């Protein structure tokens, strides 16, 4: 579950952590659809891509306090480099969550 502490809104979505090199490498590639959000931790390279993906995603870049510092929507086969360094990256299916830049999140 995700709690948007800024708006007090709760999103009933399962969080899958990509906290190892292999999980970060595979990410959402090859999936036909998802019903969860993927949280990337231990980030070394802030660039992301949507190669081998079959659907659009919303990507949220979070600082060390889980505050959204940047957001983008990507179609399959795209590459993106954020303008700010993030501590965490949250990926979800496009339009699944109503989260804006500046919102603070808590993962429950």
Across the structure, where does each feature detected by a protein language model lie?
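Compact, glycine-rich, soluble single-domain proteins
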Residues: 1-108
């Amino acid at each position: 579950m995700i709690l948007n502490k800024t708006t007090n809104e709760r999103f009933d979505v399962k969080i899958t952590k990509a906290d190892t090199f292999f999980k970060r490498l595979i990410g959402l590639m090859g999936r036909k659809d998802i019903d969860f959000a993927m949280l990337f931790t231990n980030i070394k390279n802030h660039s992301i891509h949507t190669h081998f993906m079959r659907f659009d995603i919303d990507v949220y870049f979070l600082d060390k306090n889980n505050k959204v510092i940047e957001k983008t929507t990507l179609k399959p086969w795209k590459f993106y480099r954020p303008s700010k360094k993030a501590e965490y990256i949250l990926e979800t299916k496009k339009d699944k969550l109503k989260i804006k830049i500046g919102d603070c999140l808590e993962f429950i």
